Amino acid sequence: RSLRIRSAEEADAKNICDLFARTHEQTDYLLAYPEENSYTVEQEAAFLKKLLESDRDVMLLSEVDGDLCGCASVCVVGAKYKIRHRAEFGISVDKSFWGLGIGTKLTQTAIDCAKTAGYRQLELDVVADNNRALRMYEHAGFQEFGRNPMGFQSKASGDQTLVYMRLEL
């Protein structure tokens, strides 16, 4: 099997929307439920166009043998001077591709992109029960800096604690 990681393009909009629906149905650890994705393909394409025009933000896609199986993003926390050195990191991988190291490779590529873009800190939050993700982030060098015991409210399990993590670049 062949893994390819590349930047998303406008033409990827439909496949990204489909991936979002799939991955958000497969786990309760992501921010939204599939039905909460209100982006149309056209809106996703416009969002991707804006990302492509940015010199600092990026959405990465992972493909195995040409099939889209994951995505990761690095986006500025805010444009104000005091916070523009910080970027947010998000990632999701189709469950049928878990355990193949794709998340690790996407994460490392995102870290490299964040460094190249001049960010000084990469941040994320992760559900405390998501042990696989926590291990991956810790292995990549992220460190916990706080917790929110009511960070997510899950339909299935009620309150979920969020772990806040950061990586100095």
Label every model-predicted segment:
Residues 37-96, 107-109, 113, 168-169:
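Acetyl-CoA-dependent GNAT
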Residues 100, 104, 116, 129-146:
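Conserved active-site alpha-helix within GNAT-family acetyltransferase domains
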Residues 1, 159-169:
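Terminal substrate-recognition subdomain of acyl/acetyltransferases
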Residues 12, 66, 101:
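Conserved G/P- and acidic residue-centered "switch" motifs that form tight phosphate/ATP-binding loops
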Residues 18-35:
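Helix-loop element at the rim of GNAT/NAT acetyltransferase active sites that forms part
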Residues 3-18:
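A short beta-loop-alpha structural element at the N-terminal edge
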Residues 123-126, 138, 143-160:
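Conserved catalytic-core motifs of GNAT/GCN5-like acyltransferases
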Residues 107, 114-125:
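Conserved GNAT acetyl-CoA-binding A-motif
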